[in-house]
């Protein structure tokens, strides 16, 4: 993998250069404005290109070091793109209303996430049958409300190492919280926004659907590049090892996988695997996985099933390759 490439033509075709009406501008964006046409400010893409590249590099570097990226975009035209991009690169997102204190009051947010997990367990198990229809409906509504706000971060396991924001005016509370905690912020900054306090300013249209889709795709690909770099630093060639793993190891289906009732001796530190937080490690332990050798023996289908169980299916194959290397170390 390599850092995603893009051209100025792609930015032009996506409408990245179109700012807001000139009378709605923020003077602090003057340095990034090329001029005005029909009372619409035109963003200087000659500056956007290198600044976007810098932001992509920062995202890749953060993920390569085991960091977590939080995508934030709650406006209607950004919601689907933000969620899809974050899921594609095994990162995290908020695409509904930002709850005040999501970052600065993580302890309370964690309690709400715990409640969401409990409701998921209750509603998906036989325990739900012990409630009346009205009680089940009430629980389902509570669960859906929590999932809208917290579903994208319930597996994050802690504060993010960087946030990527679409529309800094709408997401000003998220940015303020990140600044208070010294969390770097990469953001798309339109001509009506204030770039102050944004670590990685990317001047661009934050309203056009095609532009938002392009930003999210590039950030997701940069995060995937970071994952590949992290694997490379461990000496793992996933592409080369995936086929031999399936041929050499005994086949096991998701339905026949048997976890261990407990660790055999000292459990391995599964957090050494890319993207595995303390919360994900606990999920793996709950499935009876405590050692690298257990993951190393999985075939593709079983690994993917386990990845889905813990909410990170896209990283399952990489875990198998990493686990094989770590088990042999």
UniProtKB/Swiss-Prot annotation:
GO biological process: translation
SUPFAM superfamilies recorded: Ribosomal protein S2
Keywords: Ribonucleoprotein, Ribosomal protein
GO molecular function: structural constituent of ribosome
InterPro entries: Ribosomal_uS2, Ribosomal_uS2_bac/mit/plastid, Ribosomal_uS2_CS, Ribosomal_uS2_flav_dom_sf
UniProt keyword Mitochondrion present: no
Cellular component GO terms, alphabetical: cytosolic small ribosomal subunit
CDD domains associated with the record: RPS2 (cd01425)
Pfam families named in the record: Ribosomal_S2
Keyword hit for Cell division: no
Transmembrane segments: none
Cross-referenced HAMAP family: Ribosomal_uS2_B
Family designation: Belongs to the universal ribosomal protein uS2 family.
Protein's recorded name: Small ribosomal subunit protein uS2
Gene it is expressed from: rpsB
